[in-house]
Amino acid sequence: MDVLVYGCVNSAVLALMAVGFTLVYGISRLANFAHGALYTLTGFMVWTFLWKLHLNYALAIIIALIMTSIVGAIIYQTLLVRIRGMEASEVIGSFAVGLALMEFLRWKGFIGHAYAVPGFIKGATSIGGVPVDFQRLVIVFAGVIIVIFLWLFTHYTRIGLALRAIAQDEQAGMMLGMDSDKMSMISMSLGAALAGLAAVTIFPLGSITVESGYSVLIYAVAVCIVGGLGSWPGAVVAAFIIGYGQTLTDKFIASHYQAVLAMGAIVVTLILKPSGLFGKQKQLEERV
């Protein structure tokens, strides 16, 4: 029973980590390798607002998410828009931006020990005899809400429909008067905010360091590749597969093999089905 419960929590954590990465790639076909750094940046902003500026918890989160979304838009407008369509340059450029953000955090003094913030809700409950703290339930709830919100946003709002149109056929969308670069900037900004939302939701479970961005990026990429780049249903399914795999690894082998499992999932997927579980082979061939 503990595998079932904690596997669900781990899956929600991975889904939260990956949904922003999936959104950006699905719309702009841009692999944002600064995703992990944006996650870390948001976590440290919340920590600073709470412990240095003594802001209200909710206000600290809102300000941090707004600032992270602005940073995402700036990254796109100042760099990525100039190299869009050049796959190698996109990967190298976005990864370099991520490294710069993490070095900025180190320069600001976030080095050495790990940093922590309190949970939203204290206390615990029992599910099927398995003790689960309320913060983990918040993560599961947040994952469900975010997936539902994104589906409603992309199906019932003007901007969301425009984003879907650009994702499905960029040339046709531009012929209808849509600004492809503007839509990509919006997706990058929203993806950055989602990375930040994952941080503020997951951060209270433990602690965060500057290096946390690397592991978040690895897990986000693993989920997206296994599920199919740009596929939200695929990302959710892949999050459950890897999440439960990590739980079983932790229970029967050792917790430090969880990252190995994620990397192994990437390798196996690229060998057996390069387009991923829900990816489209035709789109993959067009990219290659």
Model regions and ranges:
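Membrane-interfacial amphipathic/re-entrant helices at transmembrane-helix boundaries
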Residues: 1-17, 45, 53-60, 86-91, ...
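Inter-helical junctions in multi-pass inner-membrane proteins, predominant
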Residues: 1-13, 132, 153-158, 184-227, ...
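Membrane-embedded helix boundary and interhelical linker motif in transport proteins
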Residues: 5, 27-74, 207
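Alpha-helical transmembrane segments within multi-pass membrane transporters and channels
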Residues: 21, 54-97, 104, 237-242, ...
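Pore- or pathway-lining transmembrane helices of multi-pass membrane proteins that form conduits
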Residues: 76, 81-106, 213-225, 253-273
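Transmembrane helix-bundle core of multi-pass membrane transporters
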Residues: 82-156, 183, 248, 253, ...
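Cytosolic-side transmembrane-helix boundaries in multi-pass membrane proteins
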Residues: 88-89, 168-182, 253-288
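Helix-loop-helix "hairpin" substructures at the membrane interface of multi-pass membrane proteins
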Residues: 128-209, 232-237
